Amino acid sequence: KEAPDRVRELEQWGAVFDRTPKNLINQRNFGGHTFPRLAHVGDATGLEIIRTLQERGIHEGIDIFMEYTVRHLLKEGDRVTGCVAYTRVDGDFHAFSAKSVVLATGGITRVWSVCSGSWEYTGDGHALALWAGAELRDMEFVQFHPTGMVWPPSVRGILVTEGVRGEGGRLTNSEGSRFMFDYVPEMFAGDHAETIEEADQWVEEVVSGKLATVRRPPELLTRDVVAKAINSEVKAGRGSPHGGAFLDISHRGEEAILKKLPSMHHQFKELAGVDISKEPMEVGPTAHYVMGGVLVDAETQESTVSGLFACGEVASGLHGANRLGGNSLSDLIVFGKRAGEFAAKRASDLAQPTIDDSQVQTAIQEMLAPFTNEGGENPGIIYDLSLIHISEPTRQHW
């Protein structure tokens, strides 16, 4: 109910969403969706939202502390009263007093060697909440996106947007077969095309701005189904040369691709030397999103610890066990706003808490401990050994 208002608010703040010829916000198809629901900015919607919110933050005069890592949450009794952090540039320590704290730290997918998340997706927010006494739930629910880059090794796992399939991208195996027709679960059988002709007609109707009169291609099944299908094809010996599947959008033509998928065109050209307007991409499953996280109140986003709020991927409860594509951004803009509003409302009734020096010193000692330990493991050696294991043939498949 609130997502449309948040999209309009982003537009008022300067976001530029794609428009239809009738000047309505264009909405794209994603896997698992019954209707085209996704307001988008080409294939870089997230970046546009980040840009817009950063500029808004500067306009509002919000203090932004760049390149800080929070290591410890301060508490007074059962409530959170601030945090201790260090700067990644020079290692200085800083303590912050806060009436309310909002965690918006993202996910945990850097736990996997093949993942789509940034280097910061190391579960810091989940750990901070747990150490502060907050309850976590559903941490076993991790989603693997079906289309990450697979070659060269340096870019393995980088996301290939679902928008490619939403714009008509075709998944094929090494034999040239559109294998997704063989993997439609019984519960989805009536919702997806049974023939290539029907699937292609759906694409023609949708890309021309019409309402589809036929069923959607099986490439737009939910992420778990498509990821498992690609994995099955690879294990059966029908994978691409580097252990994935082929995703082809070249039939849409260069003009349409540069208009609708400019970031993907640039990404493959620069990172893999592949022109997606002329040749297929190689893609495979990549760790993408954790549905589990901090248990929060559905209305306020407050955790089980007073004064500690969470929103986005670090929170839980919104996406069940298998998030649909695009819903993470709706989650962010709706519940991010809610978390901020309720955190501010709570803070307005409280006095500024005093920083507990003993807690700060304990946090600093914990941060410095790895530099003073005698014995233990050398993380550099462990990392090198992990690369050796990953390079073995048995570990090249997901």
Model-flagged regions — what are they?
Residues 91-100, 304:
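Core beta-strand elements of the Rossmann-like FAD/NAD(P) dinucleotide-binding domain
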Residues 9, 15-39, 76-78, 172-192, ...:
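Glycine- and aromatic-enriched mobile tails/lids
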Residues 100-158, 322-342:
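Glycine-rich loop(s) and the adjacent beta-strand/alpha-helix scaffold that form part
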Residues 71-80, 84-86, 259-315:
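A glycine-rich dinucleotide-binding beta-alpha-beta segment and adjacent secondary-structure elements
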Residues 1-16, 134-137, 142:
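Conserved FAD-binding subdomain of flavin-dependent enzymes
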Residues 135-270, 274, 342-348:
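An anion/pyrophosphate-binding glycine-rich loop and adjacent beta-alpha core
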